[in-house]
């Protein structure tokens, strides 16, 4: 792979006026996601059995069993957007303390905040098959 695609001359990313969640909106919407949508866990991990209290509560809220609740992540949610251009927009939002150790960042299109792929909330919906 010794050939690279050339970027169009003058491409400097997105204009600042391109509409996207602001840092202030993100902070507010994150707090709403935690309080009203059970967004978590606070310290995500891939360790089986970790964060039991969180996943038992999520399972009850989502009317599924704990095992199914653990399979749900922002990264496999219908509303998770981590496309290239969204990543460019996300770079405008500084990393928050809660972003560290929580996986990659994406944009939750339903709750309009920067979420992390290792977390989940009650708004989670199964992603539609891309084969459809």
Show the residue positions of the predicted features.
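Cysteine-centered metal-binding/redox modules
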Residues: 2-132
């Amino acid at each position: 792979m010794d050939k690279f695609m050339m970027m169009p001359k003058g491409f400097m990313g997105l204009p600042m006026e391109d509409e996207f969640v602001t840092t202030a909106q993100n902070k507010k919407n994150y707090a709403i996601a935690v309080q009203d949508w059970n967004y978590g866990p606070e310290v995500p991990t891939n360790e089986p059995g970790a964060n039991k209290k969180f996943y038992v509560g999520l399972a009850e809220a989502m009317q599924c069993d704990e095992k199914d609740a653990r399979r749900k992540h922002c990264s496999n949610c219908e509303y998770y957007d981590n496309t290239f251009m969204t990543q460019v927009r996300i770079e405008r939002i500084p990393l928050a303390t809660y972003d560290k150790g929580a996986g990659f960042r994406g944009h939750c299109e339903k709750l309009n905040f920067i979420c992390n792929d290792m977390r989940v909330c009650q708004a989670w919906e199964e992603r539609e098959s891309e084969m459809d």
